[in-house]
Amino acid sequence: NVVIGAHCDIASFVTINCADSHLKCIELANSIDRKDIVLENNVFVGSHCVIKGGVYIGHHSVIAAGTIVDTSHIPPYSLVIGNPMIVKEGYYLEEIIKNDPT
């Protein structure tokens, strides 16, 4: 299953793949490995990203273009960049606090 929350923006050429068949194909497994993927509300996924099975992306997170997401849990307000990916937890929460006029 793939669950996409409200107000998410998924750019062009993004691959969301909850199944991995390579072990079955080369006869090292009897079944295809399937894992759910969840994008909470207000997640942005840049172009040419790959999101692998078992990933849970917290709300208000940004996945930068070209990133391969293979870690199971991305906390809310994170910036995720690169391959191998780097998770900057709370990056956007810090930006919101810094720009809050109150």
Language-model region placement:
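Catalytic beta-strand/loop signature of glycosyltransferases that borders the donor
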Residues: 75
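Leloir-type glycosyltransferase catalytic cores
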Residues: 101-102
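Flexible, glycine/small-residue-enriched loop-and-beta-strand segment within the central core
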Residues: 1-56, 67, 72, 83-84, ...
